[in-house]
């Protein structure tokens, strides 16, 4: 299937917040309770429809460990959107958001759309970060905000699609020069396969088990 535009995304945040599970839920509509820890960068894709146009989302799922931050930083360049994820049950993942955001804004294009995601909202009995705190952080830093659950699929579609809608609006408003692919946007005619795929050799093949919601 052909597409009008291709948008490149990057998913960032601490390890274990559910980045890979969000991607899997969005591309395959399934939840994997125990997910291998991402080493390096992995890849997924899916077609969506915005304003009657087919949009292909090409999504890079990054490792959250500090030792892989240099690899992650190289993927900020050429991304139109970023999903910045924390775990509502682990306060430290929220506390680290400022560092992730600083990285994103230092290495990405200044018009990149950033969606802040408080994941694992199904675990309300273990909540350590309030919804209001997430909303306030997003407001202070000019981000879009949603709470999601990769387990139940709550707001997962909305997180990816609302980010795409914001990017599409910026195209309509002339914010992006779509002929410049360094903005993470490509005007396209053909289409590729949707669904999680392996990253480049050596980037996603070494893994460890980790719980994921």
From Swiss-Prot:
Residues 202-213 have a biased composition (Basic and acidic residues). It is found in: Cell membrane. A lipid is attached at residues 212-213 (S-geranylgeranyl cysteine). GO terms for biological process: protein transport. CDD domains: Rab2. Residues 194-213 are annotated as: Disordered. GO terms for cellular component: plasma membrane. Keywords: Cell membrane, GTP-binding, Lipoprotein, Membrane, Nucleotide-binding, Prenylation, Protein transport, Transport. Belongs to the small GTPase superfamily. Rab family. Protein transport. Probably involved in vesicular traffic. This is GTP-binding protein yptV4. The gene is YPTV4.
């Amino acid at each position: 299937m052909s597409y009008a535009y291709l948008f490149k995304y990057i998913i960032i945040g601490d390890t274990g917040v559910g980045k890979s599970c969000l991607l899997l839920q969005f591309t395959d509509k399934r939840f994997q309770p125990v997910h291998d820890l991402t080493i390096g960068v992995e890849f997924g894709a899916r077609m969506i429809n915005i304003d009657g146009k087919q949009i292909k989302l090409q999504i890079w799922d990054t490792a959250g460990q500090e030792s892989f931050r240099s690899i992650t930083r190289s993927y900020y360049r050429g991304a139109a959107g970023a999903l910045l994820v924390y775990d509502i049950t682990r306060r430290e993942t929220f506390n680290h958001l400022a560092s992730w955001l600083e990285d994103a804004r230092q290495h990405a294009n200044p018009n990149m759309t950033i969606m802040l995601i408080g994941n694992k909202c199904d675990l309300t009995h273990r909540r350590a970060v309030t919804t209001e705190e997430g909303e306030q952080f997003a407001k202070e830093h000019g981000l879009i905000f949603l709470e999601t659950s990769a387990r139940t699929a709550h707001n997962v579609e909305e997180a990816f699609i609302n980010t795409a809608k914001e990017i599409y609006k910026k195209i309509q408003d002339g914010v992006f020069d779509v002929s410049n692919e360094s903005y993470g946007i490509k005007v396209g005619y053909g289409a590729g396969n949707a669904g999680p795929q392996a990253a480049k050799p050596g980037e996603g093949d070494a893994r460890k088990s980790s719980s994921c919601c």
